[in-house]
Amino acid sequence: MKFFLNSYIENKFQLDHKKYALIIGSNPSDGARSPKLWNKVYKKKKIRCKMYPADVKLKKLKNLIKYLKKDNNFIGGSVTIPYKEKIIKYLDEVDITSKKINSVNTIMRKNNKLIGFNTDYLGFGKSLDRFKIKKQDSILVLGAGGAGKAVISFILSNFKENKKYFFNRNYKKIMKLLKKCNYKKLFVLKEYKDIYEIKDIKLIINATSIGFNTWFE
């Protein structure tokens, strides 16, 4: 089983435990924090399991998931850039939030199926608890990728009275995402330089890859 798993990933490793979890992305081995976090939890709870970063090329993603479905020792894990959207079609099921925003960041094995979830939505909402955002406060969201979709969905659902600005490098992508929304108090910026023209932003949310490990743009 170890050999076959390594045939689908770029960073080869040896499984130290029978049960294992993965963080799946293009290069999570380059500084992903999830393995360090979860492996400390497993150790403290005396759970014989370990999480590994799995660097996967897009052409091997489908076969990797196919393999993991058959391997009962795989308990689940995380999904990171750039596969939060692409991985959905290979899973057995996804939860309601994932369907809504078309993005998965967590996989769990349940009843011999791999089910996708999105914890970005609720996690982001929880992170805003410490901020006292008033109705008159303006919000700027940068990015419309996997995490960005979750952020945008939460902002649109919970801050309907606030003025909202959105920017994404791919203008067509964010317009497609927002086309069904009520455009009242909603503004989409075409160019990054347009941000400097806004004077009333109270909260800026970075949902881009800038600042993610060694990712710089």
Language-model regions, residue ranges each:
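Rossmann-like adenosine-cofactor binding region
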Residues: 186-217
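Glycine-rich adenosine-cofactor-binding loop
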Residues: 25, 116-120, 128-129, 135-157, ...
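Glycine/Thr-rich phosphate-binding loops of Rossmann-like dinucleotide-binding domains
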Residues: 31, 87, 151, 213-215
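Short glycine-rich anion-binding loops that position phosphate/pyrophosphate groups of nucleotides
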Residues: 79-86, 146-147, 209-212
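Conserved acidic residues
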Residues: 75, 137, 202-203
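Phosphate/diphosphate ligand-binding glycine-rich loop within oxidoreductases
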Residues: 2-131
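NAD(P)-binding Rossmann-fold cofactor-contacting core
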Residues: 159-181
